[in-house]
Every structure is written in C-alpha cells, then in structure tokens.
C-alpha cells in the first residue's frame, strides 16, 4: 500500500507543488487533505505557470485522479472557477473528485474573517481573508455545513441548518461589527445552486482511496501550508486552522498512519513566512530584499510580499522529527547564487540560555536570538546544473550541512521552477 505524504517543513510556500508534480508523474492518485483556497501551490510545465489553490498538483497529468479530502474547507465558487480556468489552459486534466465530508466555506465566513481582522487592527493574525478560519471554527463547534448538505435532495435539511445558523451570524454582523445582516432566502438559494454544480464531483473520498489502496494503487497526499503553522505545534496563535503535519494529512485524506511508507518534507534553501508571528532569522536588509525579488516571494493566493530569512535549522529539525520525515526536498537553492556568504541558524538563545526547540509561548519565541553558522557562498549560476556532483563545492557543502542539521536525507534539490530543474539523489548520498 504505497502512500507518500508531501508536506511543508517551514511556514508554508516551500515548493510542495513542484515536488508533488514531479512525484505525481508515476502516481495514480493525489489527495489534498487540509487547508483551503488560502493555500497556493505553483507548478511550472512547458505549457506555462499554473497556480493551484485547492486542486491537487497532480491534476495536470491525465492519468492522475485528484481528490479534495474531508479535511479541506471548500469554497464552491473558488473551486468551480479554478477548475474552469484549468480546463481552458490544459484540456487534458486528470479526474477530479471532492469528499462529501469536506466542509463548505459559506458566504458569511469571508465576511467574518474580514470584519474580525478589522476589529483586531494591529493585533490581527494576518489571515488571507478567504474565510478559512471561520469555516474551521464552525466545523469544530459542530455547526458547519458540509458538501453532502448541499447536494440535490438535501434541500429541507439544508434550509433547517441555515435557519439555525444564520441568526447567530447576523447577531455578530449587526452588534459586534456594525455591518448588515445576510438574507436567509438568498443564502439558501446560493447554497442550493452550489450543490447542483458540485454534484458531479462528489464522492465518498475515504472509501475511494481505501479501495484504490486495496487494488495496489499508489497515492500521494499533498499537504497544504507548513508544519510551523500547525495549530498545536506551530507559532500559535499565528497559525492556520487545520493541521499541515503528517498526522493531519492522514486524517484529512482518510488514510491510516500504517499505510504510509514515505514522508517527504519540503524546505526552501532559506526561510519565508506570510503574515504576523515570530520569525527568528528574518532579514529586513538588502540581502532579504535581494532574496525576495530573486525568489519572487509574493503570495500565490494574496500577492502579499513574504517575509524572508536565513535557513532555520532548529525549526526544520523540529519539523522533521515531529513528522517522522523519511527524506527531504530542498528547493530554490539557486536563489542564493549571488550571495558571498550564506548563514544557517543552528541554535536559539533566550536570555543567554540555549533553547533546543521552538518555545510554545509565542512571546518567548519572539524573543529568540538566532545562533548562526556562516558558510561561504558559491556566487555562480546553479540553475543549469543537472546533477548534484556538478554543483559548486560550496553549494554541495551547504546542502550537506542542512542535511546533517535536520537529520533527514535530502533526496531532491530544486535549482529552478521547471520540472527538469530538480537534482535527484539517492537517500543518504550526501552523508
């Protein structure tokens, strides 16, 4: 039962789409287990650049079946627009399904997101304002609407649920935020229309995946966001609303941990994050700006500039251990090409005391002083290199040192956005 999990080892935006796309060339099924349209995965092919949000990265292979799992919060209009846009540019797509157990981002969820961020002002989380957090809040509070609730034949129960839910939302809109209420009839009609449009895609996804595994099919689970945004183990409260870890990937995809034999952690050769929250290695100088511009570090979904910093091996090792990574992919190595020296954060200090892992309390994490190891840069173009052995010795040393620090073999190295710009290495070859 070959299941591979691809997940982010940092704060998201590590290049998981590129790695999933590469692995999906020989996979039967790709499942998206978590997140929502707030995530963005980029795939570059000979046909151009494809920016995916909720649809798995394997969709560009006609042989690949793609599934949006139960752990995803689905915005029906965003999903329908995304699939239509893909069909216009790439007519030969893989098959696409959506779990009937996935929760729905309803029209009131983005409004709640927006109004709450406004209310918080400078203390805001920095969300993408897509309604992701409010949708997952309703899920955990057991008052969410699921895909199954929208389908034809469920109109009576759907209206009853909305009649129960909407007064609470409107109370918040009117009395907390000073905004206009939503109309029940309009909301019901919108949801019913969504259900009709979604119906051809809806399946019992967990049953489909388990049947495929029983038949010997290969499955990739493509997690969204990154481990350091996990609501339990990340920089809470500056986190996402669903688990981007290996455990969360299993839960959202309907796969048992014992069915997983490969966990690929994806890391950038430097570090980025979007929005507020602790970021010990952040660069606010010209070096940071150079990396941001070279790496086009602007959000796939929001277009917001990403914060940029040196590689944080403390957070990366924490992530590798937490997820039980069997191997790692290191992306965007070529973005560091011009630098005369590169730094790796090898330790944390707080009040002159060494800290071996990210602190749980966000205030303590914000007080971390990074301990750096300085390595020489390579100052030459690596984007045309086709094997690891052809990289400059300084670049090889940088990769090997990261591998040593995180304790996981680096088997893939990205030196550009295209499919061909991956250097493949057997596990353990760098040590």
From Swiss-Prot:
IMP binds at residues 13-16, 38-41, 128, 142, 225, 240, 304. The gene is purA. The lineage of its organism: Bacteria, Pseudomonadati, Thermomicrobiota, Thermomicrobia, Thermomicrobiales. Belongs to the adenylosuccinate synthetase family. Its EC number is 6.3.4.4. This is Adenylosuccinate synthetase. HAMAP family: Adenylosucc_synth. PANTHER family: ADENYLOSUCCINATE SYNTHETASE. It comes from Thermomicrobium roseum (strain ATCC 27502 / DSM 5159 / P-2). SMART domains: Adenylsucc_synt. It comes from the Bacteria.
């Amino acid at each position: 039962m070959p299941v591979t999990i691809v997940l982010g080892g940092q704060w998201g935006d590590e290049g998981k789409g590129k790695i999933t796309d590469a692995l999906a060339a020989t996979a039967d099924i790709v499942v998206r287990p978590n997140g929502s349209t707030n995530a963005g995965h980029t795939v570059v092919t000979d046909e151009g650049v494809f920016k995916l949000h909720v649809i798995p990265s394997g969709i560009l292979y006609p042989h690949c079946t793609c599934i949006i799992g139960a752990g995803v919060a689905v915005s029906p209009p965003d999903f329908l627009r995304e699939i239509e846009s893909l069909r216009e540019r790439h007519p030969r797509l893989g098959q696409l399904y959506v779990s009937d157990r996935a929760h729905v981002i309803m029209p009131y969820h983005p409004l709640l997101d927006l109004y709450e961020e406004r209310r918080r002002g400078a203390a805001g989380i920095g969300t993408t304002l897509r309604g992701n957090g409010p949708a997952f809040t309703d899920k955990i509070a057991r008052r969410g609407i699921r895909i199954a609730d929208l389908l034809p034949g469920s109109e009576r129960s759907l209206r009853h649920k909305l009649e129960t839910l909407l007064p609470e939302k409107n109370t918040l809109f009117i009395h907390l935020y000073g905004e206009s209420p939503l109309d029940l009839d309009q909301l019901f009609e919108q949801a019913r229309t969504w259900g009709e449009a979604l119906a051809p895609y809806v399946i019992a996804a967990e049953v489909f995946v388990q049947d495929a595994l029983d038949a010997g099919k290969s499955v990739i689970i493509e997690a969204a966001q990154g481990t350091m945004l996990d609501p339990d183990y990340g920089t809470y409260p500056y986190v996402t609303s669903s688990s981007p870890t290996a455990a969360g990937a299993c839960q959202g995809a309907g796969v048992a941990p014992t069915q997983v034999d490969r966990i690929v952690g994806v890391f950038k050769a430097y570090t980025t994050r979007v929005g507020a929250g602790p970021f010990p290695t952040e660069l606010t100088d010209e070096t940071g700006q150079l990396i941001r511009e070279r790496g086009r570090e602007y959000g796939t979904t929001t277009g917001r500039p990403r914060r940029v910093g040196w590689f944080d091996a403390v957070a990366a090792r924490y992530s590798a251990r937490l997820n039980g990574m069997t191997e790692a992919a290191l992306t965007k190595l070529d973005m560091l090409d011009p630098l005369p020296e590169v730094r790796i954060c090898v330790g944390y200090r707080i009040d002159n005391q060494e800290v071996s892992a990210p602190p749980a309390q966000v205030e303590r994490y914000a007080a971390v002083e990074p301990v750096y190891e300085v390595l020489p840069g390579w100052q030459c173009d690596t984007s045309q290199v086709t094997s690891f052995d052809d990289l400059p010795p300084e670049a090889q040393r940088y990769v090997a040192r990261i591998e040593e620090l995180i304790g996981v073999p680096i088997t893939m190295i990205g030196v550009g956005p295209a499919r061909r710009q991956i250097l493949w290495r057997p596990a353990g070859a760098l040590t």
